[in-house]
Amino acid sequence: MSKIVGSDRVKRGMAEMQKGGVIMDVVNAEQAKIAEEAGAVAVMALERVPSDIRAAGGVARSANPKIVEEVMNAVSIPVMAKARIGHITEARVLEAMGVDYIDESEVLTPADEEYHLRKDQFTVPFVCGCRNLGEAARRIGEGAAMLRTKGEPGTGNIVEAVRHMRKVNSEVSRLVVMNDDEIMTYAKELGAPYEVLKQIKDHGRLPVVNFAAGGVATPQDAALMMELGADGVFVGSGIFKSEDPEKFAKAIVQATTHYQDYELIGKLASELGTAMKGLDINQISLEERMQERGW
C-alpha cells in the first residue's frame, strides 16, 4: 500500500492559519505554557534555543522526543519541531509522534550536504528557511508548505532577516513582470524549478506564507518585519533570553498584531526590561553563520 501524503493545498492551508501570528521557541512544558498564554499561534519544541546552540558549538541534533512529547501534552496550540537538513529519520520520527509541523532547519547541523528532504513525501507540513527567491522556490518545489527568512539565529540582530525579506520581495517583484521566456532564463539563473516560478508569477506572490525569523529580539523588531511584508514572526532566543520572558512574549505578540500602532508599540517597549544581548553580524565568520547552511 502506498503511503498517504498530505496535499499541497491542505498543508499550505494549515500554514495559512498561522498568518499574522507569532511562533515561539520553547525548551520545556513551562515555557510552552508561557508562550500559549501570551498568545502565540504555535510553539517550536527544541532542546536549546539558537543562542545556546551557537554558544555550545559541536553537533546540534533534533530534540529528544521526550521534550517534544512534553510540550505537545502541555499546550493546545500547534507544536513544531526541528529536524536536521536532509535527515530523513529525524523527520519521520517527528511525523510519527504527531507534531503539527516540521522545520527542516539550518539552526541544526546539516545531516546531508547535497540534498534537502523531499517534503512532498511526508504527510506533515514543513517549514523551511530562505534568503532569496532561488532558495524559496527550491524549497517549495521540494514540498515546503511554509517559509521563513533565515536571518542569523541566536544573535538578537534583525539585520539579516531584513535583508532576506527584502531580497525575496524584490526578486518576486522582478519575476511578476516577466514573460514565459524570461521566466525560463530566470529559473536557470536562480537554479529554481520553472513551474514554481510560474506559479509565483500567477499568484503575484509566493504561494506559501513567509514568516520572519532569525534575530527578532524586541517588539519593534517584530513590527518592522510585518511592515516589510512578513506573514508572521518566529521568535527564537529573543523571549526566553530576555529579562522578563512573560512580558516580552506578550509584547511581541501585540506588536506583531498591531504593527502600525506606533504609540502602542512604544508603550509596550517602555514597560519591558532588558532585551537579550545581541551579536554584531560582522563579528561572525561565514563558516559560523547558520544562514549559510542549506543550498
UniProtKB/Swiss-Prot annotation:
D-glyceraldehyde 3-phosphate binds at R166. It comes from the Bacteria. One of its GO terms (molecular function) is pyridoxal 5'-phosphate synthase (glutamine hydrolysing) activity. Keywords: Lyase, Pyridoxal phosphate, Schiff base. D-ribose 5-phosphate binds at D25, G154, G215, G236, S237. GO terms for biological process: amino acid metabolic process; pyridoxal phosphate biosynthetic process; pyridoxine biosynthetic process. Disulfide bonds: none annotated. SUPFAM superfamilies: Ribulose-phoshate binding barrel. It is an enzyme of class 4 (lyase). Its EC number is 4.3.3.6. Pathway: Cofactor biosynthesis; pyridoxal 5'-phosphate biosynthesis. PROSITE patterns: PDXS_SNZ_1, PDXS_SNZ_2. It catalyses: aldehydo-D-ribose 5-phosphate + D-glyceraldehyde 3-phosphate + L-glutamine = pyridoxal 5'-phosphate + L-glutamate + phosphate + 3 H2O + H(+). The active site is at K82 (schiff-base intermediate with d-ribose 5-phosphate). Pfam families: SOR_SNZ. InterPro entries: Aldolase_TIM, PdxS/SNZ, PdxS/SNZ_N, RibuloseP-bd_barrel. NCBIfam families: PRK04180.1, pyridoxal 5'-phosphate synthase lyase subunit PdxS. Catalyzes the formation of pyridoxal 5'-phosphate from ribose 5-phosphate (RBP), glyceraldehyde 3-phosphate (G3P) and ammonia. The ammonia is provided by the PdxT subunit. Can also use ribulose 5-phosphate and dihydroxyacetone phosphate as substrates, resulting from enzyme-catalyzed isomerization of RBP and G3P, respectively. Belongs to the PdxS/SNZ family. In the presence of PdxT, forms a dodecamer of heterodimers. This is Pyridoxal 5'-phosphate synthase subunit PdxS. It comes from Staphylococcus haemolyticus (strain JCSC1435).
